[in-house]
Amino acid sequence: MSEKHPGPLVVEGKLADAERMKLESNYLRGTIAEDLNDGLTGGFKGDNFLLIRFHGMYQQDDRDIRAERAEQKLEPRHAMLLRCRLPGGVITTRQWQAIDKFAAENTIYGSIRLTNRQTFQFHGILKKNVKPVHQMLHSVGLDALATANDMNRNVLCTSNPYESELHAEAYEWAKKISEHLLPRTRAYAEIWLDQEKVATTDEEPILGQTYLPRKFKTTVVIPPQNDIDLHANDMNFVAVAENGKLVGFNLLVGGGLSIEHGNKKTYARTASEFGYLPLEHTLAVAEAVVTTQRDWGNRTDRKNAKTKYTLERVGVETFKAEVERRAGIKFEPIRPYEFTGRGDRIGWVKGIDNKWHLTLFIENGRILDYPGRPLKTGLLEIAKIHKGEFRITANQNLIIAGVPESQKAKIEKLARNHGLMNAVTSQRENSMACVSFPTCPLAMAEAERFLPTFVDKVDALMTHHGVSDEHIVLRVTGCPNGCGRAMLAEVGLVGKAPGRYNLHLGGNRIGTRIPRMFKENITEPEILASLDELIGRWVKEREAGEGFGDFTVRAGIIRPVLDPARDFWE
């Protein structure tokens, strides 16, 4: 994209303060251990507020009661979000029972939140329960290491591919990549698991003493499903199979969706194709991409620090050549691949060995016992009898995987009795939101709490126009950081202020095109009025099989984003 304007390999200038914090942290220890014992505050102070992110936690507070507590001269009700490391979203039923118990007994909200990065989060962990949550995870073979901040985050892997044999191989690679790129510091084990300090000096051969310039996200994807939304990620391994066996990967680098309102130096970007590599080079290439970004990423401006900006600054070919040099390989030409969809296949799907997979739609990924729909209890009951595993999907749903024919009826009965298989519209299945209020400190507008009733209204429009059995990929994100992946939707809403959103149009169903802003800072009635008109036109004027996003581009309603570094804001 940007070979015309190659810039410096390293950005000189005053380093961002986060770089000082990492350097002085003694490999991510800081004074977290001492801070844990400070009962005068429910939060972590100073650098520790940011350092705990490397340990998989964010400090939050309940924004619904923030003003009320301030009036009472009380500090905000601090509580932690904890995000588990769960490559490929695979979790055993024993592990599920442990996290269910912890959520019920030791969190403010009592829920498990499935995320669109294939893991789960606990919201509302008080400071006194922070150490116990890490110890509980460790006791069942899990951890929260490197699920936030400037590291390689949770590695995604296609959940329910059409060829299940490939899933086992791809999942193993997702785990290997995750383990290979983990930090080597013993800080996590010392602070949370009470393991002894070792006399040897810490070293970080891959990540370095100041870790990465910014967050880094990786996927393993099995076409034709793009359920993991590869273009939202820094590094993507697209599976290439021959005769049903995995033989290598196409590598795509430099995707990312977060922007800052009004900051023209920020933009969403799809990933660039680097080439094909045989399986045996996977870890060397993963390491080479990460270390190139480690050394060349912008450490002076965190808003321009992600891999997508490094690629645009130095040029795709320059970055690719450096990866080849470090990995000691030459990429082969990209092998053919195509995507046909990215939604989950809700309901039963037959896999190999006569085993079945049941994908359950979980609205917003929020697992809780609702009136008449005790979802959390239902999943616990299934976990008690299911001998296979659960898989969390990148669409915030849950798969009961590996069900033998003999257990199928029993598991389906439990699911139906607990409201886990209630019929929902295609539109609802293809709509998604991030958490946003009340817990996210960055939220500008509602997302998770807004989505269910908003989808009711979109469903009414779809019915009115005679397309109630069809869908538009709809995403709502509460702020421009973009966790809801609205920047890969056919209709994307990006929070601007309470009750107000920027409306983006022109993405496509398979998630390979960035949508452009259509209207700025508008209310729900204004959004619905626009959609009413546009859905009406789509139904009347579309070509056979043409999705809503493709139609808005072809009809000239919105110009496609072709080169985001230059035309995203036009």
From Swiss-Prot:
SUPFAM superfamilies: Nitrite and sulphite reductase 4Fe-4S domain-like (SSF56014), Nitrite/Sulfite reductase N-terminal domain-like (SSF55124). It is an enzyme of class 1 (oxidoreductase). Keywords: 4Fe-4S, Amino-acid biosynthesis, Cysteine biosynthesis, Heme, Iron, Iron-sulfur, Metal-binding, NADP, Oxidoreductase. Binds 1 siroheme per subunit. The keyword Iron applies. Its cofactor is siroheme; [4Fe-4S] cluster. GO terms for cellular component: sulfite reductase complex (NADPH). [4Fe-4S] cluster binds at C434, C440, C479, C483. Coiled coil: none annotated. One of its GO terms (biological process) is cysteine biosynthetic process. This is Sulfite reductase [NADPH] hemoprotein beta-component. NCBIfam families: CysI, PRK13504.1. Pathway: Sulfur metabolism; hydrogen sulfide biosynthesis; hydrogen sulfide from sulfite (NADPH route): step 1/1. It catalyses: hydrogen sulfide + 3 NADP(+) + 3 H2O = sulfite + 3 NADPH + 4 H(+). InterPro entries: CysI, NiRdtase/SiRdtase_haem-b_fer, Nit/Sulf_reduc_fer-like_dom_sf, NO2/SO3_Rdtase_4Fe4S_dom, NO2/SO3_Rdtase_4Fe4S_prot, NO2/SO3_Rdtase_4Fe4S_sf, NO2/SO3_Rdtase_FeS/sirohaem_BS. Its EC number is 1.8.1.2. Siroheme binds at C483. Component of the sulfite reductase complex that catalyzes the 6-electron reduction of sulfite to sulfide. This is one of several activities required for the biosynthesis of L-cysteine from sulfate. GO terms for molecular function: 4 iron, 4 sulfur cluster binding; heme binding; metal ion binding; NADP binding; sulfite reductase (ferredoxin) activity; sulfite reductase (NADPH) activity. Belongs to the nitrite and sulfite reductase 4Fe-4S domain family. Alpha(8)-beta(8). The alpha component is a flavoprotein, the beta component is a hemoprotein. It holds the Pfam family NIR_SIR_ferr.
